A protein has these predicted regions:
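Conserved acetyl-CoA pyrophosphate-binding loop and the N-cap/start of the following alpha-helix
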Residues: 98, 102-110
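Conserved beta-strand in the GNAT
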Residues: 61, 67-75
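A short helix-loop-beta-strand connector motif used in the catalytic cores of GNAT acetyltransferases and
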Residues: 49-61
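Conserved GNAT acetyl-CoA-binding A-motif
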Residues: 116-127
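Conserved acetyl-CoA binding element of GNAT-fold acetyltransferases
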Residues: 84-96
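Conserved GNAT-fold acetyl-CoA-binding loop/helix
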Residues: 24-49
Length: 131
């Protein structure tokens, strides 16, 4: 699964190194939304290292009519009880002007399908209690 059209002109694709500036911008927008912008120390070099050199985490980008509407960042964990890996979703962020239109659900569906395809035993995430 490299790219998937979710509905109409909304598609989700895996990020590439060319996306690093937009990923960082989206991370900062998310942090601002959560009133945590002061805590962001990530920069383009760190994102390149961990996303594309060491491949510890993955990012997917959602686009509507070739315009970025949001992103999700996730990584593997492992369940000793299941004896299988799982996927932990660290972030799902949809830009303000695109919220409440189903794009967030699209990210979750994409990752759930990916988890099934990769033989994962579960998919997990947590949400701030005020969100």
């Amino acid at each position: 699964m490299v790219e998937k059209e979710i509905s109409g002109r909304f598609s989700i694709r895996f990020a590439t190194p060319n996306d690093i500036p937009i990923i960082l911008q989206l991370i900062k927008e998310l942090a601002k939304y959560e009133n945590l912008l002061h805590m962001v120390v990530a920069d383009e070099k760190l994102l390149d290292e961990w996303l594309f050199q060491k491949k510890v985490v993955e990012v997917i980008i959602g686009e509507m009519n070739n315009t970025v509407v949001g992103f999700s960042l996730f990584f593997y964990n492992f369940s000793t009880f299941l004896g299988k890996p799982g996927i932990y979703i660290e972030d799902v962020y949809v830009k303000k002007e695109y919220r409440h239109q189903g794009y967030g659900k699209g990210f979750f569906r994409f990752i759930a399908q990916l988890a099934r395809e990769r033989g994962c035993g579960r998919m997990e995430w947590s949400v701030l209690d005020w969100n």
